[in-house]
A protein has these predicted regions:
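Extracellular glycan-interacting surfaces
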Residues: 1-374
């Protein structure tokens, strides 16, 4: 079990796991060996934290968090000292225009922009919309082409709300970006956000009369690797897919998984053929199959999947891993981390081959982000 220090002690080269829960955020720090972890938290006690990010562009270490309260709403907080202090909680820079008739319910995703655009950032929010900042997060505005999309009145919330949980900027072509939300599916732009096209060909919507509509799919997560920018992987509400043409079409890759239902999906930091998922049983039960906690990994871009269970409980483990609660660091070998709704955090320092319990007893985990501190 990790120690519980009085403050943040992350140093350059350390690995940081940022964990968002329904009752605050927790920071876990280790050296490069990733064998012993120290915990700092809770930050924002009593508030839900669905989105966290470390912005390491330019050698900086800026933490971003989006704590939310049912009474006081959602805020966006910044720390320039790895969580020792945070920006003013009363600042509310993320707002919908009054004429839109919308109000911010929750921030689901914080995405720093390209390395050579240090002032650019994006947010995915609920009700579903993409916000952009061009001044390092000081001010924010919704992307007009998405806010005013002709499909907006037809989008409906899933069980988790009408939430934009995925933002995938194209690493080469700055005019291209892909987003995903529940329930609406995948949309992409090729003109810097002026227009957006539904991009769900091949992705099924099992819960609709038309199983393959233009939009309306309940996509749970999409990931890509910068070395293969036009290839995408998608975990759907029933369905596991890959696209090789920047979401023009999707192919089923549920080869050897116990269930193609799940939420979480993460990309290996250096291998564009390696992806991690955590399958869940059925639409109603939503726990890992056979009560065995297993991460599944493909090393051939979805042609086959294999369970990773060394160090994970294989009996009586009725666990659930949510859509943003699985991530990888950028170390070599890669670290892989996930959190469960029962408040456990697990980590691997060897590409997922073996696992250890980082911490247990946390509130329900909804977000896990990992990074090497620059």
């Amino acid at each position: 079990m990790p120690e519980n220090p009085s403050g943040s002690h992350a140093r350059p080269g350390d690995v940081l796991i940022m964990v968002g829960t329904l009752k605050g955020a927790f920071l876990f720090t280790s050296d490069g060996s990733r064998k012993k972890w120290t915990m700092d938290g809770p930050h924002f006690p009593g508030e839900e934290v669905y989105a966290l990010a470390l912005d390491a562009r330019g050698g900086s270490s800026t933490l971003w968090a989006a704590p939310g309260s049912a009474f006081w709403g959602t805020t966006l907080r910044r720390s320039d000292d790895l969580g020792a202090t945070w920006s003013n909680k009363d600042e509310r820079p993320v707002r919908f225009p009054e004429e839109s008739g919308l109000s911010l319910k929750r921030i689901w995703q914080i995405r720093p922009g390209p390395i050579d655009e240090p002032e650019t950032m994006w947010l995915g929010v609920e009700p579903t919309c993409l916000f952009e900042s061009g001044d390092g997060g000081e001010s924010w505005a919704p992307v007009k082409g998405f806010l005013e999309h002709e499909h907006r009145e037809l989008w409906t919330p899933g069980n988790g709300g009408l939430c934009m949980h995925t933002i995938v900027p194209h690493p080469v072509d700055r005019e291209r970006m892909l987003v995903a939300f529940s329930t609406g599916g995948v949309y992409k732009t090729t003109d810097s956000g002026s227009s957006w096209a539904a991009s769900n060909v091949g992705v099924r919507a099992e819960f609709l009369p038309d199983k393959h509509p233009e939009f309306g799919q309940c996509v749970h997560k999409v990931v890509s690797h910068p070395a293969r920018p036009d290839r995408l992987f998608l975990q759907n509400h029933w369905g596991l897919y890959r696209s090789d043409d920047w979401a023009e079409s999707w192919q089923d890759i549920a080869n050897g998984v116990p269930s193609d239902f799940g939420f979480a999906m993460a990309m290996h930091p250096s291998d564009p053929d390696t992806v991690y998922i955590v399958p869940l049983e059925s639409d109603e039960f939503r726990c890992v199959p056979e009560a065995k906690l297993r991460v599944y990994r493909t090393r051939d871009a979805g042609a086959s999947w294999h369970p990773l269970a060394d160090g994970l409980p294989q009996e009586g483990a009725y666990e659930t891993v949510l859509r943003d609660a699985l991530d990888t660091d950028s170390a070599d070998p890669a670290g892989v981390y996930f959190g469960t709704r029962s408040g456990k955090v697990y980590g691997s320092a060897d590409d997922g081959d073996s696992w250890t319990l980082v911490h247990e007893g946390l509130p329900p985990v909804v977000c896990v982000k990992a990074a090497v501190v620059p």
